[in-house]
Amino acid sequence: MVGGWLRGDWSVVSGAMFAAAWDRQAHVCDSFPIPDSWQIFRACDDGYSAPSSVHWIALDRANDRFYCIAELYQSGLLPEDLARLVLARDRSILVTDGYGRVSQNTTRLAGVIDSAAFSDTGTGSPARANQMNKLGCDWKPCEKYPGSVAHRAQKLHEYLARGRDGRPRLLRA
């Protein structure tokens, strides 16, 4: 996975769900400050023994394009540790205003997280997502329904496909 995100080489993940759809030349672009008119959000697949995976996405509505602008992939994180890392990354995102001035993000970001992170652990402790929300790391549960995983995988394949302009709708910046 690291080779995929760092170098854009998803061929290293043999048999991966999106390996056939991934093309480094088409899907990787240089990083850039995000226009402050774009929406930035994050998505998390929470884990402890298995890694937590957080992706920051910038949405360019004018061109109907999504940019994955940052990623965190780490196991063994307690809720407060994950919240601290996520909030630090939120603030490190570079944004630009309409006048070309670049600064660090000051907008409070929100995201979706696997609804299991809101489940009662049976230990008397609050659910992991609730612990993070309490620390200012805002999460809403990702809605699940029968077939939702397959549906979302299909949507990602559509975003990775080239559009009318010859470019995919999902890129890694």
Protein language model features and the residues they cover:
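ATPase catalytic-site recognition across NTP-hydrolyzing enzymes
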Residues: 1-46
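Mg2+-dependent endonuclease catalytic cores in nucleic-acid-processing enzymes, primarily RNase H-like
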Residues: 55, 62-173
